[in-house]
Amino acid sequence: MKSRDALSRLKRFDVEEKRRKVAEIESLIGDFNQMASDLDRQIAIEQERAGVYDTNHYAYPTFAKAAIQRRDNLLASVADLETKLASARETLAEAFEELKRIELLEERDAERMKIEQARAAELGAVSGLPHRVAS
């Protein structure tokens, strides 16, 4: 019984750790998307300032070119993080299912123990002697 309690605690810890990992990845995706939209605004401002919107034009602002490259890198990172997020969510779901299975086993054991204690109490009442249940 104690080993199952330890296993249950371990599984709960595992689920919480995986939940933190999912939250961390979601936070990174949000941050990267925010940075990309900030860069989009900066690119638009720089294009407006220079009056050149064609990236292949010789007078296109160097800052805007660099910002476009950074934005593209951020968006590529977001795409990579989204695949990692899907994988992390899948492992979280698996860990959660495992935890639920362990908790169901614990509930079944607790119910079995109650039944055994009730039987022991009945036997003790019938025989007039206290009856002990092995725990």
Where are the regions a protein language model picked out?
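Charge-rich amphipathic alpha-helical interaction elements
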Residues: M1-S135
